Design a protein with these regions (language model features):
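Charge-biased, low-complexity intrinsically disordered regions
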Residues: 1-227
Length: 227
């Protein structure tokens, strides 16, 4: 299984951080009607339960925003992906229907408020990723949005460079319909409404149901624990 390092900067500035890393062999077909119905229902429940001004006060989203501030990044300009998705749900805007793994990850982000990275393991360079802090001018091509200024953002890097931030994953390691091996980073910057184990179990159950996941491996890393 891939090794994960957490930089001293993250340990110092965001000591509550924890990441659940999942690897699995998968299939990644177009999203089924059944999964899409689950997503639409989760969106409806969220829209009926909170107002827009409450979105960034959901515990998991608030904790991610606080991490951004601790690292010197303005979360209103570079919203965590879970917050952006939650806002879209509450506004009643149509969500984008994509591939099974992408959409089931979005479903868990709607339900939990956590931002989750999902990568094609075969596109990740090397056997180790490290969570550090983005540098000024560091190149990063975000999925669907082009060049992203990741300075002061928490960023996972492989042997080549950045692959994922809570705002957007990198185009280089994105999932496609041909993805066979999956790498997930469930980024937990603080406790949410769902406990961490419940979020993890939900994610793995959806992977089995909608992505035919096999050979699932899981590991947990914490910023407040020595490696």
């Amino acid at each position: 299984m891939i090794d994960v390092k957490i930089s001293d900067q993250i340990r110092e500035k965001v000591p509550a951080y924890k990441v659940v890393v999942i690897e699995a062999d998968i299939k990644n077909p177009a999203t089924s009607d059944e999964l899409w119905h689950e997503i639409q229902e989760a969106s409806r429940r969220l829209r009926e339960s909170i107002e827009m001004e409450q979105v960034n006060k959901r515990p998991a989203i608030k904790a991610t925003r606080e991490a951004y501030k601790a690292l010197g990044k303005e979360p209103n300009r570079y919203r965590p992906s879970a917050e952006a998705l939650n806002r879209r749900c509450v506004k009643g805007l149509e969500l984008y229907r994509s591939l099974s793994v992408i959409d089931l990850v979005n479903l868990v982000s709607i339900e939990s408020g956590h931002s989750i990275g999902a990568f094609d393991r075969d596109a990740v360079a090397g056997d180790m990723i490290e969570l550090g802090v983005g540098e000024e001018g560091e190149p990063y091509e975000a999925i669907g949005r082009g060049a992203l200024n990741i300075a002061c953002l928490p960023v996972f890097r492989d042997a080549i460079g950045g692959i994922g931030t809570p705002t957007s994953d990198n185009d280089r390691t994105k999932l496609s319909e041909t993805t066979k091996k999956l790498l997930i980073t469930l980024n937990i910057y603080g406790s949410g409404e769902m406990n961490d184990e419940a979020v993890t179990e939900r994610l793995m159950a959806l992977l089995i149901k909608y992505a035919s996941a096999r050979n699932i491996m899981k590991s947990v890393y914490r910023a407040d624990c020595a490696e």
